[in-house]
A protein has these predicted regions:
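Short hydrophobic/aromatic beta-strand or adjacent loop that forms the aromatic wall/cage
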Residues: 82, 177-181
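Conserved catalytic-core motifs of GNAT/GCN5-like acyltransferases
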Residues: 145, 158, 163-178
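Acetyl-CoA-dependent GNAT
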Residues: 3-5, 35-40, 44-116, 127-129, ...
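Positions that flank functional sites
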Residues: 72, 149, 172
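Conserved glycine-rich acetyl-CoA-binding loop
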Residues: 114-128, 137, 141, 148-155, ...
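Acyl-donor-binding surface of acyltransferase catalytic domains
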Residues: 1-34, 184-187
């Protein structure tokens, strides 16, 4: 019976394509992170945080790469299968990650760390937090795309266990740069 229920739940999730990441039972992994004597607070992103996320993107991306505030608001307020986590230092947003779950895959849509706060483990911390959510949601895969020219990010993702599985030709529309598809297989605990 349990096997049948699991199959039905998996089938339903694939049909609907959503699991609730706003459920009060969603365990929020860690509430803070310490690096170089700084204590960062972890916060689940809400619609009101969209402007802060746009500002963060502006520090790291070219204007044509920035997700609009309206899209981020919609992602955080209406899509129950999306999750945004922010890291704050003294109430100042310094990093965020966006992800969504569909079926057995957790996909990172966005990871930004403000220059000046990079290379302090913040990106790695956020990736680990989303991975724990993915494991709690019984995901088998953790995926993302990265610019072919972004060697620093690729190094981080490889360090985290992601493998390059393909090239998406001209994936980034602003300059037609190829994107590398990367996947990490997740091992579910019994």
């Amino acid at each position: 019976l349990k096997n049948w229920i699991d199959q039905l739940q998996s089938w339903w999730t694939n049909i609907v394509g959503q699991v609730s990441l706003r459920d009060s039972s969603l365990p929020l992994i860690q509430e803070s992170y310490t690096s170089q004597e700084r204590v960062y607070q972890l916060k689940v992103g809400q619609k009101a945080d969209a402007k802060s996320l746009v500002n963060l993107q502006e520090t790291a991306y070219s204007p044509s790469e920035i997700w609009p505030e309206s899209l981020l608001e919609r992602e955080m307020s209406t899509k129950s299968n999306s999750l945004y986590l922010l890291l704050l230092y003294q109430d100042y947003p310094v990093a965020f990650i966006g992800a969504w779950i569909k079926g057995d895959n957790c996909h990172v849509s966005n990871l930004v760390v403000r220059p000046g706060y990079q290379r302090q483990g913040l990106g790695q911390f956020l990736l680990n937090q989303v991975e724990q959510v993915a494991l709690n949601q019984n995901c088998h895969y953790y995926s993302l795309e990265v610019r072919e020219s972004n060697h620093k990010a690729q190094k981080l993702y490889h360090k985290q266990g992601f493998e390059t599985v393909g090239v998406k030709k001209e994936y980034y529309s602003n300059n037609r740069e190829d994107g590398l598809a990367m996947v990490k297989q997740l091992i579910l605990k019994d």
